[in-house]
Structure formats: C-alpha cells, structure tokens
C-alpha cells in the first residue's frame, strides 16, 4: 500500500472515530448536566463520616486543622501508625461531590465506658460544633429536614450529628436527651460490643 493511500485510510479512520465519539461526548455532557441539576435541587446526604475522630486523633483540635485545604496532603502526626491513610474529606471535595448534608459521626471506642463515655461523646459533639463555627460560609448545623433545606438554600452543607453506639450514653436516657439537644439525630444501638440492653452480635 502506497503512502498516500495509507494516509487517506488513516484520516478516514480518525474521522470515523471522531464522528462516533461526538454523540457519546454530547450524551455524557447531557447526563452530567442532569446530575448537576438534580443534586442542586435535592440535597445528597452522606450518612456517616468519621472526620471528628480523625480531627481529635490527628490534630487535637479544630484550630490545628485546615478544612478548606486538600486534607489528603496534610502531614500525618509523627506518631501515626503505618496503616493510617490520608484524610478523604474536605470542603473542596464535599463541594465537588455536591454533598448537601453530612452526618458527622461522634464515634468513640467501645473500650471507653461509663461516665467517661458520656464525657468523650460530648467532646466529639463539641468538635462538630467548632468545625461548623470555624467554616460558617460552608457549613451550617441542622437538626431537621427543614434545616437541611434552609442550609441548601443558603449554599451551605447541612451538618448533622450521629452517635455510633449505645455505650456512649452509659444507660442514661437523660444523657441521650441532652445529646439530642446538642444536635445528635441518630444513635446506633451498638457498635462492636454489647450494651446492657442490646447485643452487638460480635
């Protein structure tokens, strides 16, 4: 096959591929626009995020943590275990993911029991409140569906609180009521150990 013929065949093949690819790209752009529209209209709610514990464990307080930066690039603590992974949540990624509401987990280890569990849970709730207060242009506390809608209309990410185990209330309904008053909106019955009133099946 001579060079001009080969060039013509190559150009024809490229033209066919481009012509075939154009509808696919248009379809992808249309689909992406539809997804963006839905997520701008209906809040996407993430039901679990362990960031409050990571802030406590890695930084000690919200003041030492830059949530507006790419948290995957933040240095790990000097005493970090080898299997510690970079953080996966920050404001830029929440925005890119169109997250409209985030349940921040106020998990504590099941080895912490009794009054100490209540104290540590309150400290974790305080981390969430401090995080929201530090980034008021991006985050807003929410305790109801109406609060989530208001946060979305204001262009903020609704911040809700979830308790990750019944051990965190030390068998105390008054403690649970006070945690609710501070913003907690769910509590799992158990985490990885039994309570006096629920079996973790582990």
Protein language model regions, located:
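N-terminal hydrophobic targeting/anchoring segments and the immediately downstream early-domain regions
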Residues: 25-202
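Bacterial N-terminal signal peptides
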Residues: 10-19
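N-terminal secretory signal peptides that target proteins for export/translocation
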Residues: 1-5
């Amino acid at each position: 096959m001579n060079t001009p013929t080969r060039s013509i065949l190559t150009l024809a093949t490229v033209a066919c591929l481009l012509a075939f690819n154009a509808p696919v790209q248009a379809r992808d752009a249309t689909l992406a626009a539809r997804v963006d529209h839905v997520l701008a209209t209906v809040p996407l709610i993430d039901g679990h995020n362990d960031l409050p514990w990571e802030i406590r464990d890695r930084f000690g307080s919200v003041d030492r943590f830059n949530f507006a930066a790419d948290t995957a690039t933040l240095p790990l603590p000097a005493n970090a275990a080898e299997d510690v992974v970079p953080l996966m949540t920050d404001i830029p990624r929440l925005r890119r993911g169109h997250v409209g509401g985030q349940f921040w987990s106020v998990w504590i280890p099941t080895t912490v029991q009794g009054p100490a569990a209540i104290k540590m849970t309150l400290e974790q709730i305080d981390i969430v409140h401090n995080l929201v207060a530090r980034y008021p242009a991006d985050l807003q506390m929410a305790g109801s569906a109406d609060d989530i809608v208001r946060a979305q209309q204001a262009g903020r990410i609704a911040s809700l609180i979830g308790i990750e185990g019944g051990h965190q209330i030390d068998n105390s309904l008054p403690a649970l009521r006070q945690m609710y008053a501070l913003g907690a909106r769910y509590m799992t019955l158990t985490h990885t150990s039994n309570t006096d009133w629920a079996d973790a099946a582990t």
